[in-house]
Amino acid sequence: LKLDSSSVMVFIDEAEYVDDNNDEYTKIDGWSSGTFKTIYLSSDKSIESKGKTLETGDIIRYKTLNGKVRRVVMDFDASEEVFAETGVSSDAYFNGKVKYSSLQFQSGQVYSYDNGFIYLSSVKDSAGNYDFSYKNLRNFGCDTDNIILVDRKNKTVLPGTRSDIRSYIDSKNKASTVVLVQSYLVTKQVIIYVG
C-alpha cells in the first residue's frame, strides 16, 4: 500500500478502543490536513516504528483501503529530531534526497524566513548546535498557512501561524526547528517544534 502526502499526521496520542461489535482497535489522535483527526487501526496491525514508542509530535502516515486504516508508518522521531528508519524511503524522500515525487520531508533549524522562502540547516556541529555556514543552508519555498505548533515539553499540538516561525537571524539561539512537508517540492505544511 503506497503512502502519500495526503496521509501525513502529527501524532498526539493513542489508546486501545473497542467498538460496538467488540472489534479491537488502536485509536490514534493527531493533526492532519489542517484539522484534528482520529483514525482507528485494527488490533491485528501494528504501527511500523522500528520498535520506537510514538510520542506527541512524531510524524506518521497512514493508508486507508475501503474506509479502513490498513497501515501506519512512523516517519519522524520528534524527540530525537531524526527521520525514522522504517523502510519506507521508496515512498518519501528525506533531507536532500529530493526527487520529483508526491512526498518529501525537509527538516532543520530556521536560519531565515522571509517573503515566502525559508533557509534551513540540518547539519549540527560537534557541540550539537546547528551549523549555519553557507554550505549547510538549503532554501525552500514556504508560502503556506497550514502550520502546526508542537510543544514537546507540554505534549500539545496546536494550530500555528507564520509569526511562530523564528529565524536564527532574528532570534539567535531561539530559532525554530521545523519539518516541511512537501509535495512535488511545494511546501504543503510546516511543523514547528518547541520545548
What are these regions (language model features)?
Residues 1-195:
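...the same signal can extend to comparable exposed beta-sheet modules
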